[in-house]
Amino acid sequence: MRTSFVVGATLLGLACGGGKATRSGASDQTPQWLADGTGAIRGEGGKRLQGVGVASAVADPKARRRQADAAAREQLQTAVDALALALAKMSESTQPNLAPTTTGIARKAAGQVAAIRDHWVTPDGDERALAVVELDALRRALQAGDGDDRIRGEMAANVERAFDRVAER
C-alpha cells in the first residue's frame, strides 16, 4: 500500500510538472533570437525583421506577458521604420516628403503580417518576447496594401535590397 502511494505520488508529480514557459537561464538554453536582438535578421527560415521586448519586475504573469509583447512590437516598429527609410532613399519618386509616405505604407503592411512568435522567461522572472515580420510576407502585403500604387510597387520591388542595406548596419 505504501509503495503504491509513493509510486502514484511520483507519477502524479511527473504528470503535473510539464508545460512551464520558464526555461533555465543557462546560456546554452537561451534562444538564438535573443542573441540576434532587434533588427534585420538573416536566418534559417529566410530574411525577417524582428523586435525583442523585455518586461521586468512585473509580478502578474499575464501583465508581464502583455508588457513584453508590447515592448517587442515597439522594437519591431523601429526595424520597420529603418527599412522604410532605406526604401525612401532608394526611391525614384519625385514626390516631396516621401519618407513619411513610405513609413506609413510600410507600417501598415507590417502591421498586417507581424506576429509574436516566442517568449522566454528568465529564472529571475523577466520575460522576453519576439515579434517578427517575414520579408516575403511584407513584400506581399506591400503589393496588396493601400496607398499610391506606384510607390507600393516600387517598395515591394526594392524591399530585398533595402533589407540588405539595413542588415549591414
Range-by-range predicted roles:
Residues C16-R169:
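Domain-level marker for long, solvent-exposed, non-transmembrane regions
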Residues M1-A15:
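Sec-dependent bacterial lipoprotein signal peptides
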